[in-house]
Amino acid sequence: MLDSPTLDLLDSLRRTMAEKSFLVVTGAGISTASGIPDYRDKDGVRRGAQPMMYQEFVGNPAARQRYWARAMLGWPRISASQANAAHRALAALQAENLIKGLITQNVDALHTQAGSQDVIELHGSLHRVLCLDCQQRSDRTAIQEQMLAHNLYLADVHATQAPDGDTLLDPAYEAGFKVPECPHCQGKRLKPDVVFFGENVASHTAARATLSVEQAEGLLVVGTSLMAWSAFRLCKAMAEQGKPVIAINHGKTRADELLRMKIEAPCEQVLPWLAEQLITR
């Protein structure tokens, strides 16, 4: 249940969104209700082990072996995840032309599953795999089937789920792992089609996001601490243009000083309420 102070803030947000065309940017917090772990605590501090860096992944075969061994065990959770009420609420708002567009930092494709159109996937998608040699893309399901067939020794191994389809796997299981091959060129330098730490967002994706900010009259940030520059810069640009930036997020965000309003309540409760109010009025 949403308490009275939260409902007062939400009513103010409803009035603002009824008057202005808002762009929405989402982060890991919108998918936690779908069973996908997020990255940071309420103070914006990253949980768990440090992520693999792009240069390490590209330049070190052992790093790729480690990544894919862990990712093979993490994929079933990602592939089975279902969009939750927050994803569906944003899809409903978009269908009624009540939001200007949708940008996500998430790589789980749950916005698309919920029915959202033309989602800008700022950091890519785990549902695709890119070959670093021939640049062809493959469906993640096909790569998963290949890895399972070649690494039967991991079939019954349990590993704790981590963000972005990663797992906490005992290193003893990694050494014998056979990395997947590209179905197009048989190369062994496959990478999930996502932006790693230390890697730049594709220029065409960044340009689409920038244009979306320019065309919108306000920005609604959902479920993200905005610690990644790729998303924070959008808030900064919006605020510099004198447009309102509003957040629905538990805890600290990098953009707190830029926010007109912050609602600290579960997005899977807040967004359905907001959608119902905006659509029925």
Curated annotation (Swiss-Prot):
It catalyses: N(6)-acetyl-L-lysyl-[protein] + NAD(+) + H2O = 2''-O-acetyl-ADP-D-ribose + nicotinamide + L-lysyl-[protein]. Keywords: Cytoplasm, Metal-binding, NAD, Transferase, Zinc. Residues 1-281 form the Deacetylase sirtuin-type domain. One of its GO terms (molecular function) is histone deacetylase activity, NAD-dependent. Zn(2+) binds at residues 131, 134, 182, 185. It comes from the Bacteria. NAD(+) binds at residues 27-47, 105-108, 223-225, 249-251, 267. The keyword rRNA-binding does not apply. The active site is at residue 123. InterPro entries: DHS-like_NAD/FAD-binding_dom, NAD-dep_sirtuin_deacylases, Sirtuin, Sirtuin_cat_small_dom_sf, Sirtuin_class_II, Ssirtuin_cat_dom. Its cofactor is Zn(2+). Its EC number is 2.3.1.286. Signal peptide: none annotated. GO terms for cellular component: cytoplasm. Its main location: cytoplasm. It is an enzyme of class 2 (transferase). Binds 1 zinc ion per subunit. NAD-dependent protein deacetylase which modulates the activities of several enzymes which are inactive in their acetylated form. PANTHER family: NAD-DEPENDENT PROTEIN DEACYLASE SIRTUIN-5, MITOCHONDRIAL-RELATED. HAMAP family: Sirtuin_ClassII. Belongs to the sirtuin family. Class II subfamily. This is NAD-dependent protein deacetylase 3. It comes from Pseudomonas syringae pv. tomato (strain ATCC BAA-871 / DC3000).
